[in-house]
Amino acid sequence: KGRQTFTNIEEVVEADYSNAAFLDAFNLLDGFVKVKGLKTSSYQGDKRYKKYFKELEENMPTLDISNCVDLGPILMMIGCFKNGVVLTGTKRLAIKESNRAIAMKEELEKFGAKIDVGENKVIIEKVPLHKPLEILDGHNDHRIVMALAVLLSKFGGKISGYEAVNKS
């Protein structure tokens, strides 16, 4: 115990799928962002974002986020912009930096979104969106700010509390 020796190791930390999802989301709103360095053999639950993005493009899917809860805000945003979405496994959204389901509902409704938040499910209907008439609130949550920033790139507007992204 007292005479242990530390041996250096060299490891490469793989890219973060959760943060990559926010960047890749710009492409669904007619942007052009290249996301590089993601390992397809990753064990990160958030790597399913690419599959979920494809499903959001095609129809109003039901997506289980119980093992990738950090994707909740960006999937809610895309669901509003595309074809709607039913997210299940959402109860852990309430115990993050903010109650992410409620925070996204409040902010996305400023765009005209129609969202129902249940205990473990979020339902977002496809409705026309518009530029928000008021300043959005980042809810002191970096993932809320990042998801809203993607949508604001399409509609314009402002976010208060954007400094929360410094965590990312």
Tell me the role of every PLM-derived stretch.
Residues K1-S168:
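Short, structured segments at the rim of ligand-binding sites
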